């Protein structure tokens, strides 16, 4: 499954490596465990549709998405994030994606997940895949507790380019020597600047763009 050329492989997470979107499943988890009202599921679905359409309001979304984190410490949220992975994500990890990352690790090729999902929720998935690094939206902490806001830039669309460039440079490579796997048009900014763009389980619009540009297309199972 490894193709020749790239010195570094970077993967989007939701709907790319896993058959799920953690921003949606997190709210389902929160409702299941009494951390959020039933109405949160429909609201999460609405934000997800906005995300796919490229019109997500990041401020409103983060205010909603991080409600369960506010006032808690990273240590206190580690167990809910682990439980979320076990209940919603583990069984939805694509076997072929797991095998690809395993083969890359065996060949000592640097790998990373770069996701718009916050790194607290994404951490168990990154650990399960065994990638070298997790990059994503970081949460702000003051006095040891989550504030409900983000630290730095929201890792979506063009916000993925800087962390990707930093990662590959630290591994002695350039974006031109990098493969990036993404599933939606929100990944286009990074797909356009890497040397080896891969449309993975692409939405119809990304599949069309990938075909027009002769990009690799893969559908993980």
Language-model region placement:
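Active-site neighborhood of HAD-like aspartate-dependent phosphohydrolases
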Residues: 1-56
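Conserved active-site and cofactor/substrate-binding residues in soluble primary-metabolism enzymes
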Residues: 21, 72, 159
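N-terminal-biased segments
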Residues: 46-63, 143-144, 150, 164
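Metal-dependent phosphoesterase signature
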Residues: 60-96
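A generic short alpha-helical patch detector that favors 3-5-residue windows
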Residues: 53, 69-73, 156
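C-terminal cap/substrate-recognition subdomain and adjoining C-terminal extension
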Residues: 1-6, 79, 86-221
């Amino acid at each position: 499954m490894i193709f020749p050329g790239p010195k570094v492989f970077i993967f989007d997470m939701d709907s790319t490596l896993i058959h799920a979107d953690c921003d949606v499943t997190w709210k389902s988890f929160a409702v299941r465990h009494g951390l959020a009202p039933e109405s949160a599921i429909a609201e999460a679905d609405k934000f997800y549709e906005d995300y796919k359409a490229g019109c997500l309001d990041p401020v409103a979304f983060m205010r909603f998405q991080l409600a369960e984190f506010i006032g808690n410490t990273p240590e206190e949220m580690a167990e809910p994030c682990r439980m979320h992975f076990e209940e919603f994500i583990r069984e939805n990890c694509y076997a072929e994606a797991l095998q690809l990352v395993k083969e890359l690790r065996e060949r000592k090729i640097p790998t990373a997940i770069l996701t718009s999902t916050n790194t607290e929720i994404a951490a168990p998935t990154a650990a399960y895949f065994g990638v070298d690094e997790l990059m994503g939206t970081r949460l702000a902490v003051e006095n040891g507790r989550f504030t409900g806001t983000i630290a730095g830039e929201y890792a979506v669309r063009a916000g993925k380019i800087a962390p990707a460039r930093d990662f590959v440079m630290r591994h002695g490579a350039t974006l031109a020597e990098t493969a990036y796997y993404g599933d939606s048009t929100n990944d286009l900014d990074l797909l356009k600047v890497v040397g080896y763009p891969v449309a993975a389980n692409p939405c119809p619009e990304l599949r069309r763009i990938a075909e027009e540009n002769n990009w690799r297309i893969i559908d993980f199972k």
